[in-house]
């Protein structure tokens, strides 16, 4: 009916819908790490945001996961888990959800990206803190994870020189 289309038109003309995507990257001679960012606003209280990283071995073109880089993945997982917990505790920030440690323990399933100085783990909004706290990022210098890396990991990250 005409009335229905008038209502539809009134409610959609001024609707501020927005989708944005972005890519950033870091690479050395052996590894390429893409970070994909996405923001979507569909009329709610605030936009939804999301970030994901994907890394590639430049010699093979294959994706690289954290498990590919570790001598003992359980030891690496525990070490990084403890380092993230320490950063949270040292920050004094009280906005984290009360059970954030249950999510942080699965950091390996989050967005993990590399640069020349270390590894960054990203927890998207609502993963471990409310939207108002934003995404939570934790940087860990390579010297703290190097003992847990296998030869392949040391090679890709150019820590074998």
Where are these regions (language model features)?
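Short helix-loop boundary/capping segments
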Residues: 51-101
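Short, surface-exposed charged micro-motifs
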Residues: 22-24, 53-55, 109-111
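Active-site acidic/histidine clusters and adjacent loop/turn architecture
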Residues: 1, 5-32, 37-41, 116, ...
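Compositionally biased, intrinsically disordered linkers/stalks adjacent to structured regions
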Residues: 81-138, 142
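Short N-terminal helix-initiation segments at or just after the protein's N-terminus
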Residues: 1, 5, 53-65, 127-129, ...
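Short, surface-exposed coil-to-beta transition loops
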Residues: 18-20, 47-52, 107
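A short, polar/proline- and glycine-enriched secondary-structure boundary/capping micro-motif
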Residues: 44-47, 74-80, 131-135
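Contiguous hydrophobic, core-forming segments of folded domains
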Residues: 27-66
């Amino acid at each position: 009916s005409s009335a229905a289309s008038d209502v539809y038109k009134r409610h959609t003309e001024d609707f501020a819908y927005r989708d944005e995507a972005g890519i950033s990257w870091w690479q050395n001679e052996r590894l390429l790490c893409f970070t994909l960012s996405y923001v979507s606003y569909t009329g709610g209280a605030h936009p939804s945001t999301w970030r994901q990283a994907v890394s590639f071995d430049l010699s093979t073109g294959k994706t690289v996961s954290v498990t590919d880089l570790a001598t003992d993945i359980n030891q690496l997982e525990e070490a990084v888990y403890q380092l993230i917990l320490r950063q949270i505790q040292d920050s004094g920030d009280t906005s984290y959800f009360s059970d954030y440690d249950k999510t942080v323990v699965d950091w390996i399933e989050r967005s993990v990206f590399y640069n020349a100085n270390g590894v960054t783990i990203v927890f998207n909004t609502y993963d471990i803190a409310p939207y108002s706290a934003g995404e939570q990022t934790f940087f860990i210098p390579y010297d703290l994870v190097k003992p847990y890396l296998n030869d392949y990991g040391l090679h890709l990250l150019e820590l074998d020189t």
